[in-house]
């Protein structure tokens, strides 16, 4: 059984419907019926408009989403294991990881990944899979945050932004974290069994 992570720097259904990268994710799933895809909007603090766009983007799938009050549900692991795709939205990486760890949801995601669920995510939802990431704070500065460690190294989305690029380059030079992936908003990385399979430009 292959393990798959698709790390999206920007774009996707939050900007375009239909979006090529979202079709690409669905095509990764081998399913006889409707693809079961679950959206995890923790990083946006469950912004309703974001959730609505998710359902609009995947009308032919068996779509669902997970709210913060359900993260620690005793039924959550079984639910996640039933999904073909777990799609993590963008937003505040630090807030998202804190909520996940408080609920033990990070461990549930790792287990679902080992069971064959495709992990996909955009921006914060892409950074989180790596060992460590550099995250923007509310005051515009940046801080190092420990990721889930499913993929080695670090990942920087939105690398076309001058302030982010400068902060990341300085941090990466001092921290010497490898591998180090820097992506602009039209780029995506596809990993299979923790190895980089492809870089997509959309």
For the regions a language model picked out, list residue spans one by one.
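Short glycine-rich anion-binding loops that position phosphate/pyrophosphate groups of nucleotides
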Residues: 11, 91-94, 125
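Conserved anion/nucleotide-ligand pocket segment
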Residues: 155-201
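Class I SAM-dependent methyltransferase SAM-binding "motif I" and its flanking Rossmann-like core
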Residues: 97-99, 106-166
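Flexible gly/pro-rich beta->alpha loop and the following alpha-helix that scaffold active-site loops
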Residues: 63-117
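Solvent-exposed alpha-helices and their adjacent loops that cap or buttress functional pockets
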Residues: 79-80, 111, 147-149, 173-174, ...
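N-terminal beta1-alpha1 cap of cysteine-dependent amidohydrolase-like domains
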Residues: 1-85
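Structural motif
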Residues: 7, 85-89, 120-121, 155-156
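Short, hinge-like loop/turn segments at secondary-structure boundaries
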Residues: 55-56, 137-139, 198
């Amino acid at each position: 059984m292959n393990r798959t992570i698709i790390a999206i720097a920007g774009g996707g259904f939050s900007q375009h419907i239909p979006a090529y990268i979202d079709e690409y994710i669905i095509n990764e799933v081998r399913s006889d019926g409707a693809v079961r895809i679950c959206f995890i909007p923790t990083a946006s603090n469950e912004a309703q408009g974001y959730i609505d766009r998710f359902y609009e983007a995947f009308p032919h799938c068996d779509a669902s989403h997970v709210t913060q009050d359900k993260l620690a549900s005793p039924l959550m692991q079984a639910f996640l294991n039933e999904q073909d795709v777990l799609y993590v939205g963008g937003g505040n990486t630090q807030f998202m990881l804190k909520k996940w760890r408080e609920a033990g949801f990070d461990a549930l995601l790792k287990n679902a990944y080992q069971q064959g669920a495709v992990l996909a995510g955009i921006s914060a939802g892409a950074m989180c899979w790596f060992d460590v990431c550099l995250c923007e704070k509310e005051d515009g500065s940046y801080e190092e945050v420990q990721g889930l460690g499913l993929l080695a190294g670090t990942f920087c989305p939105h690398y076309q932004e001058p302030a982010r690029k400068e902060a990341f380059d300085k941090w990466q030079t001092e921290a010497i974290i490898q591998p180090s992936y820097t992506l602009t908003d039209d780029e995506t990385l596809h990993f299979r069994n923790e190895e980089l399979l492809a870089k997509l430009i959309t």
